[in-house]
């Protein structure tokens, strides 16, 4: 496992962020750092994503910022060019995975079936995103797939919350969980970064409680 994935694993929870305005990037990053989760997956669902990553990477070098919802090789290049330290995609697009590996970008593609998992193994990956986690069978499905694929670690995302994250984190097949409950869009849009910091601190406490 590469150092990037090890750092994600040490964080335990990766806040999955949707930013509509790049001006929200710095106060959000500050809230996450102060709350104890200096990590963020900024999704490429908005026009502000690239600039948001750039601002976070520049202002908060201690922040482990990556890009999520990366669907194309061009998005991957833009994200890394802006300062993203890792790439996450919702599905497994062989073209995107191959491009990222060739360029040396840490890539975690999404899977939800054993067939997709085997494709990931074929690329030499040892961590995959399990998405959409809860709708795709949750922890029960991950444990079932782990039986024949003992070498693979998972980063479940989708439907993870402050309640069920404990069960996921307690499983030794889980590298980290992606979640957005501490960075909800309405809180970001309202500029309520104090509440985001509070929720982030609570999330970080869960990681410490479960993993020590």
What are these regions (language model features)?
Residues 1-82, 102, 151, 162, ...:
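Conserved N-terminal beta1-alpha1 strand-loop-helix module at the mouth
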Residues 18-20, 67-73, 89-93, 109-114, ...:
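Glycine-rich beta-to-alpha transition loops that act as phosphate-gripper elements at the mouths
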Residues 25, 53-57, 121, 142, ...:
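Distinct, well-ordered alpha-helical segments
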Residues 28, 72-82, 115-123, 160-176:
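Catalytic cores of alpha/beta
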Residues 33-38, 59-62, 80-87, 102-108, ...:
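Glycine-enriched alpha-helix->loop->beta-strand junction motifs that scaffold or abut catalytic
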Residues 90-96, 129-139, 173-195:
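Glycine-rich phosphate-binding active-site loops on the catalytic face of alpha/beta enzymes
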Residues 93-127, 131-136:
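Histidine/lysine/aspartate-rich catalytic loop segments that bind and position anionic ligands
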Residues 135, 140-155:
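Shared catalytic-loop signature of beta/alpha-barrel
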């Amino acid at each position: 496992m590469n150092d990037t994935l090890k750092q994600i694993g040490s964080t335990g929870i990766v806040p999955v962020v949707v930013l509509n305005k790049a001006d929200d990037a710095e106060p959000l990053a500050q809230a996450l750092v102060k709350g104890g989760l200096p990590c963020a997956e900024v999704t490429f669902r908005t026009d502000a994503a690239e600039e948001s990553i750039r601002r976070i990477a520049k202002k908060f070098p201690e922040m482990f910022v990556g890009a999520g919802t990366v669907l194309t090789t061009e998005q991957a290049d833009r994200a890394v060019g802006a300062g993203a330290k890792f790439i996450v995609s919702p599905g497994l697009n062989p073209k995107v995975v191959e491009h990222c590996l060739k360029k040396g970008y840490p890539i975690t593609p999404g899977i939800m079936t054993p067939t997709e998992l085997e494709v990931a193994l074929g690329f030499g990956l040892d961590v995959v995103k399990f998405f959409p986690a809860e709708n795709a069978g949750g922890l029960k499905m991950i444990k079932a797939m782990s039986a024949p694929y003992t070498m693979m670690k998972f980063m479940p995302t989708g439907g993870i919350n402050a309640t069920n994250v404990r069960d996921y984190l307690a499983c030794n097949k889980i590298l980290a969980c992606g979640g957005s409950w501490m960075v909800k869009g309405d809180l970001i849009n309202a500029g309520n970064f104090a509440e985001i910091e509070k929720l982030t601190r609570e999330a970080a406490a869960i990681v410490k409680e479960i993993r020590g």
